A protein has these predicted regions:
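Cap/insert and terminal regions of metallo-dependent hydrolase folds
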Residues: 53-129
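Core dinuclear metal-dependent hydrolase active-site scaffold
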Residues: 3-64
C-alpha cells in the first residue's frame, strides 16, 4: 500500500467509509480499520504492540470493537515452547497487545455508543480459554 507519507488512508465504497491506519507491528503494512456507515462505526485492530496516541480520537466511542488481546504476560514468560527472542518480540512495541494492555486501551476508547467488544488474535498457548 502506498502511504505517501500519511499514517491514515480514507476510502469510500458507496455509503461505506473505510479508514485505514498503520499499526505498530513487525510485519510490512500492518493496518487497522474503522468502518463507518451512517452513524454506525466498527473498529478492527490486531497485530499491534501499542496504540499510538494520535489514533485515540479516531478510535474513541465506536459501536463495535474487534480488538487484539493476544496473551497473558506471565503465561507467555512461563511458556517453555517459546524462545526468549520470540517472547521479547511479542512483548515489544512491534509485537502484540497483552490482555492487560488491551483492557487499558479499551477502557480509554469505549463510550456511550459502544455495544460490543470482541477480543481477537488470542494466543492458543499464552492465553486463558
Amino acid at each position: 500500500m502506498d502511504w505517501n507519507g500519511n499514517s491514515k488512508i480514507n476510502l469510500f465504497i458507496n455509503d461505506l467509509n473505510v479508514k485505514i491506519f498503520k499499526t505498530s507491528h513487525d510485519a510490512v503494512d500492518s493496518v487497522g480499520f474503522v468502518f463507518s456507515n451512517n452513524d454506525k462505526e466498527f473498529v478492527y485492530v490486531t497485530d499491534t504492540g501499542y496504540i499510538k496516541n494520535k489514533y485515540f480520537e479516531l478510535l474513541t466511542n465506536k459501536d463495535i470493537y474487534v480488538f487484539e488481546s493476544n496473551h497473558d504476560v506471565q503465561m507467555l514468560m512461563d511458556n517453555p515452547n517459546y524462545p526468549y527472542q520470540t517472547k521479547q518480540r511479542i512483548l515489544s512495541d512491534k509485537g502484540h497487545l497483552s490482555n492487560k494492555d488491551s483492557s487499558f486501551y479499551l477502557s480509554k476508547l469505549i463510550g456511550k455508543k459502544t455495544k460490543h467488544i470482541i477480543l481477537a488474535h488470542l494466543s492458543e498457548q499464552n492465553n486463558d480459554k
